Amino acid sequence: MASRGKTETNKLKVNIEEQLNRLLAQLQDIEELKEDITQEEYDETKKDTLEQMKEFEQSLKKMMSGDMTLVSELGGVQLAIQAAVSQAFKTPEVIKLFAKKDQNSLRTKLGNIQRDVQLGKISKDAYIDQSVEILAALKKLDFVLSPEEEAFLEKHKSRSMSEFEKVSSNIGQGTKENILSSAASQIKNASK
């Protein structure tokens, strides 16, 4: 009987991760098609997607308030949604890797953008922005950064990234109240 509850929890977790991946893929598609659509279409589509993420977050809140065993498992998904809604991370791929806690892929992405800036494929500003996102994600997931990476992050992190770090630090404490209050403040700020 106990395994049945665990099986249902695992199925729910898979469904939640699939929904998050769908929304993140949608965000990534919007960014990739930005040049091919009008600014109005871009803004409207992005707004709709962020609204869907807010609705998804509300559903997660309801689930977490009813089942405390899901709180820790859903915390990472909640944090990824907060990052997207608050727009602390601009790169959907980074949000996706962050939600999956995929250190290797984040490190690979960091190496790729370092190579791309040296080859002139991306601008220095894009390199800095994406590097900060990746390093902040790695740090938030408690992966060790080199002293050089720490210094780079401190030098370049934006106010929105600082806010995200401050708010998301509550998630690590694992309490339902902190998760819910953090989510509420992020949604309130994103709505402004």
Curated annotation (Swiss-Prot):
Gene3D superfamilies: Beta-catenin-interacting ICAT (1.10.10.490). Keywords: Coiled coil. It comes from the Eukaryota. The keyword RNA-binding does not apply. GO terms for molecular function: beta-catenin binding. The keyword Coiled coil applies. Residues 6-65 form a coiled coil. Belongs to the CTNNBIP1 family. PANTHER family: PROTEIN LZIC. This is Protein LZIC. The gene is lzic.
